[in-house]
Structures are given as C-alpha cells and as structure tokens.
C-alpha cells in the first residue's frame, strides 16, 4: 500500500547493575567511528522508557563517554553530550535530593556546585561551551559522574547512605505488601 511505512521500533537496552565494571571505570573518549545519530536515538528511547531525566551510555552497557539529559524538563528538550568535560566549578554549593536509574528507589541529599562551565560535543561533532546552573547543572554533574566511574552514593557519608538504603528497602516492602493486598 502506498503512504504506509513500517517503522522498526528501537529496542530498549536494559539497565546494567551498579556493580558492573562498566559503571566503575572512567570511560575513554568516544570512538571515532561511533554512529552518533543512532546512539542519540538509543539513549532517548531508553531514557524515556525508564522515565529518567538523564542517562549515560554506560548505564545501558554502552562503553562510550556520552550521556543524554533534559535541559528543560517541562518542554521535554534534551541535549546529548559527547566527551563532556567540566572546565570550572563555581564556589557555591547546593544540597538537593538525587535518585538514579541504576539505584531504583534510592534517594540521597547530595551537595554539588550550583554552577559550572563545561565543554562537550553535540551529535554533529560541534564543540559546545556553556555555563550551567540549577537543576540542569545537577543533572549534568550526576551523569558526568557516571563517565568518571563514580556515582551519587560516593557523595554522601556511609551513615547517610545506609540510612537511605534502609528507607528504600522499607518503601519497597511496603509497596509489595500493598500490591499483595489488592
């Protein structure tokens, strides 16, 4: 039939476990032969599927130094950052709640710089130099940590992390009990 097209769905890549080596090691620069447009689609598809506001390639098992994030959550505007690099941190810090797709249900109060300057390459390979503030800066730094082989659990004390893990376990148990009651 004319006018009809078959659209091949993009498969959803599974999230890797936080203990996977790909999440612990700093990532090298992006591969020269990387298909940036295809990776952009893959990241957006996975980020939307998992209902995240940011997603690094290594979270779905792709060993490339790249992440995608919402630059404006309300407008659903995204940016994709290849080979990101923070060039200067501001002195002011702010504490905000953070969660992570690879740590479901875990929320931590994390202190980070409120402002910074960074460089990254866009999907077309163009250098972007920007300043980020507020929530946009928070998301960028969180995803940047993944590129560096670390995560938000390393930014709080062991005591606070253990308390948050207990809270998350209690919430999961409560959630399971409420499902069983139905």
Positions of PLM-derived features:
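Positively charged
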Residues: 1-182
């Amino acid at each position: 039939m004319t006018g009809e097209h078959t659209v091949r769905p993009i498969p959803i890549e599974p999230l890797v476990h936080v203990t996977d080596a790909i999440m612990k090691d700093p990532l090298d620069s992006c591969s020269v032969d990387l298909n940036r447009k295809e990776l952009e689609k893959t990241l957006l598809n996975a980020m939307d599927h998992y209902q995240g506001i940011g997603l690094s390639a290594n979270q779905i098992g792709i060993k490339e130094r790249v992440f995608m994030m919402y630059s404006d959550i309300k407008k659903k505007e995204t940016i994709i950052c290849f080979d990101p690099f923070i060039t200067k941190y501001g002195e002011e810090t702010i504490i905000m709640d953070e969660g992570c797709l690879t740590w479901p249900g875990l929320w931590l109060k994390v202190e980070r710089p409120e402002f910074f300057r960074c460089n990254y390459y866009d999907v077309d390979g163009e250098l972007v130099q920007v300043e980020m503030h507020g929530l946009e800066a928070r998301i960028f730094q969180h995803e940047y940590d993944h590129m560096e082989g670390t995560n938000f659990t390393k930014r709080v004390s062991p005591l606070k992390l253990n308390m948050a893990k207990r809270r998350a376990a209690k919430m999961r148990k409560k959630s399971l009990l409420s499902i069983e009651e139905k």
